[in-house]
Amino acid sequence: MKNWLIGLVVTMAWTSPCAAQIAPELLGGADPNKPMFSESFYKGIEGNWVLVREPVNTGYHCSVNFITPDSTLSLRGPADAGMARKGHGSLWLISGAIPLVTKPEIAPITLSSTNHPTQNVQAAHVSMPGQSSGALLLTIDVQKSVREKPDSNELAIQLQGKEVFRSKVVQLQLAYRQLSACMSAARK
């Protein structure tokens, strides 16, 4: 299981076309000559939501990214048909407080939120290419994740007993709708 998850993490980290910490304006906006399309769909005091997808929407490589000055939460849909059949997507948590690693590893983390009980789970711990921060990656059932839920959530992540991520995420329903609409192109 660990080798499979590490393989998935390495593949997604190096082949995933969007790095959530990159400023949206650098991802290409609506320019068809850029590798990714990005569109801000919410700007608020707490942070900004940005949709990122391929210039021609295939329904794969869709993500919604909640970006604050300190962190990014990236909810990503399937990268290909195989992941889509299994309902797999990923949750990326990126923060300057997450240490860099020399190679991807599986790490126990404590995830607490206002909407769920505290959980101890395994996450992939990776370094972001070209970034000075690390990231934590959880494989998720993306269809369950975008179902109706509370519209805000405060998340905190501990790694090795130290808090490395905290964010009050707002406008979740809007983000879920944006991600679902983007992923629906794969079903057409």
Model-derived segments and spans:
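Short, linear, compositionally biased motifs with a strong N-terminal bias
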Residues: 10-11
